[in-house]
Amino acid sequence: MTKTLRVAVIGAGRMGADHIKRLSTRIHGAEVAAVVDVDLARAQAAIEGIDRAVALASADEALNNGDVNAVLIATPGFLHEEILYKALEKDFPILCEKPLTPDAGSAWKVVQAEQALGHKRIQVGFMRRFDAEYSALGAIIRNSELGELLMLHHQHRNPSTPEGFTNEMLINDSVVHEFDAIRFFTGEEITSVQVRLGKPTRSAPSGQHDPQHVLLETESGVLADVEIYVNAKFGYQVATQASFEEGIVSIGSDNGPYVQTAGKWGGNVTPGFEERFGAAYDVEVQAWVDAALRGEIGGPTAWDGYATAACCEAGVEAQKSGEKVKVQLNTKPDLYK
């Protein structure tokens, strides 16, 4: 059995660079063997100071490198599908940043390819499942400590959006995390999505309606709502309140130092997702490595990637129509049950 994962990180942009640093400094049982980027200079800069790592310009070079036995995909989503097929052919353990692929049709093809392999090889990077507060709330739900879960209320707020962040990206790039969180908390599929567009902020760029209110329902009737507000200015905030038969649980509050000075009181707001979920990323990658070294794959699966893609498609349709849209899912293969 493999004692060390020799990982090819494909994509050396913001997320890829963060994972390269993580693998080379904080993760046990894994090493960076190769970094791939179309900008070879960026790949070379990313491996500086990492022993035995090579910079490459193509995923094929990395996958055929005899020193590589695992793959972490951090490229833009539209490039994932081809890399996933080739990594599955090698039977490598794969950690794929979300999305699995950009649409449900191609994601389903990846699910079928993995199913044909006969065992799971893909973990999808929904890192919130590994956050300590998310894990704690999940345990409360699973153990029925407060009775049955009835409703979920989510807030997802960003200080601003980069240039080119479209209306559809509020669903595909942001609410996608809540889609997975709701499925994680309830253990159920989301059956319908509705999007309501209210009064927009003046800070929203042209062509973007912000904020939006997303309403969802699960198989057992759990209702969930998401406030997505991506130009909130004040900082980054991801919070959830869960309503049970016998109580309420809230997670995601900023609980840093509370300061009183010079006639003022208060604390600091988390500036971005790296600060809020940095520890969760570490736990996520370590869990992937530990499972891969046992010959297993844990965490969010290719099915989870497919199901969230289907939710996103329903969400974008609901954005445009204003109607409640049914989430269309194929039958779940036995491999993921």
From Swiss-Prot:
EC assignment: 1.1.1.18
Biological processes annotated in GO: inositol catabolic process
Enzyme class: oxidoreductase
Annotated keywords: NAD, Oxidoreductase
Single Gene Ontology MF annotation: nucleotide binding
Top-level taxon of the source organism: Bacteria
Keyword Translocase: no
The keyword Disulfide bond belongs to this UniProt entry's keyword annotation: no
InterPro entries referenced in this protein's UniProt entry, alphabetically: Gfo-Idh-MocA_inositol_DH, Gfo/Idh/MocA-like_OxRdtase_C, Gfo/Idh/MocA-like_OxRdtase_N, MI/DCI_dehydrogenase, NAD(P)-bd_dom_sf
Catalysed reaction equations from the record: myo-inositol + NAD(+) = scyllo-inosose + NADH + H(+)
Family, as annotated: Belongs to the Gfo/Idh/MocA family.
Function in brief: Involved in the oxidation of myo-inositol (MI) to 2-keto-myo-inositol (2KMI or 2-inosose).
Subunit structure: Homotetramer.
Protein name (record): Inositol 2-dehydrogenase 1
Organism: Paenarthrobacter aurescens (strain TC1)
